[in-house]
């Protein structure tokens, strides 16, 4: 693993190992495989995923999140996969598979055989989510093993491609407000055995908009902390609650960024730019991979790790990569260090408005808490 980067712990202590650990704690054989994550025995579990709640961010904010911070010591952090981004992480959680197997390889990635990108959050390219991610989900496997599985999320996500890719097989319950979410969790947990998944995206949104060093982010963290404590108080004591996250976040000042559109050497040989600002997929013109690697390394220097696809695969960044998934990855991938970012504002104009970013392999982005309440 390159300097300053955190290796993903696939099959050991990664986000994709959480549901296998839950199944083991329930005593349910869902065929999800072993994991080193150990959770307390229980027949009813609620998994609460807080988007953007990195381990280091929580560690550094004990006053803003006293309840969640008090739970930090019981479990070592887990890693997410690469890239450290929501679409990839949620699918790893939901399938118990690494990105190279489940195939949701980033925020945006090329649809093989085309010059188009799939936005995995919006699922906007007419791609069948069941074909793009064809493996059974962990939710579905647990349901088949007799566990009442429920996903509680905003109503708008009920039939989204990302929900279908990573969470099909569970009953979906729409809940747009915190109170609805709590009520849904309580109702879903009445059966035994049961697994209920809750999602909250407000902390991530706030971090993108204002940065993780902002008062707004700290206030939102406090609200999440109160919501988690209320969830624990509302549920019966024999219902286990596990709080996890899909990635951390770093603030990237706008003067610490490079725009591909403004540097001709970064455009030569590149047919399509995908990924996101902290982790880019570069899809190259025929025969241009070596030249693109050399040019990007020359321009970016130590600010980013620039690797060919084969080099990144050899490092194990994506876990086991299936032949059908392989061409979805960039011919070249670019992982940023420190607070650096690579924008492409012609293709991704919204990046000019995002102060907090994630996607790379720094510990601030890769490490997430496993909190048992």
Across the structure, where does each feature detected by a protein language model lie?
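Feature captures the catalytic ectodomains and active-site-proximal regions of enzymes
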Residues: 1-373
